[in-house]
A protein has these predicted regions:
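Thioredoxin-like thiol-disulfide oxidoreductase module
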Residues: 38, 71-75, 79-121, 128-140
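N-terminal leader/targeting and pre-domain segments
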Residues: 1-48
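Local sequence-structure signature of Cys/Sec-based thiol-disulfide redox active-site neighborhoods
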Residues: 39-79
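Second-shell loop/turn segments in exported
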Residues: 30-31, 56-61, 82, 117-120
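Phosphate-binding glycine-rich loops and adjacent basic patches that engage nucleotide phosphates
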Residues: 29-37, 53-58, 89-97
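Loop/helix-junction capping segments adjacent to catalytic residues or to phosphate/diphosphate-binding pockets
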Residues: 60-64, 89, 127
Length: 141
């Protein structure tokens, strides 16, 4: 201890901190998806176990309502959501090849790795969409 009023330096040893070992995290496995899905749906399935897909015509008023309801149902059920414009061949072409003709509006529910678990041709309200997601989640193997 120093005497008050002196300018002596304190003597002591410096304690060097021990370096912490680097934490190595396991690299996540890539998610394998079924081929033939639209790129937007595949991207959503990489982030979410279940994804709601809404097929809509932007020029049809009822399709806009259906799109909003499907989005709300997906949000309530904590699922991914993908709107696909039926007037854009690049977006809907892969689904048409898999499912044949799909009317608009339509709501599809997919589960990883790309399995279609629910399909609603025509209007589906938010409660119906949310319940379909909940049912699909409960049936997940």
């Amino acid at each position: 201890m120093r005497k008050p009023g002196t300018h002596e330096t304190l003597r002591g040893t410096l304690v060097k901190p021990h370096p912490k070992p680097a934490v190595v995290h396991a690299k996540p496995k890539p998610i394998a998806l079924l081929p033939g899905l639209p790129p937007e749906v595949a991207a959503a399935l990489r982030k979410h176990e279940l994804v709601v897909v809404s097929l809509y015509d932007p020029q049809a008023r009822v399709d806009q309502i259906s799109l909003a309801e499907a989005s709300a149902g997906a949000e309530v059920a904590h699922a991914g959501f993908v709107p696909l414009n039926v007037l854009r061949q690049r977006q809907t072409g892969p689904l048409m090849r898999q499912l044949g003709v799909v009317p608009d509006p339509a709501v599809l529910v997919y589960r990883r790795p790309g399995e279609l678990v629910a399909r609603f041709d025509g209007f589906a309200d938010r409660d119906t969409v949310a319940q379909a997601v909940v049912n699909a989640a409960a049936a997940t193997p």
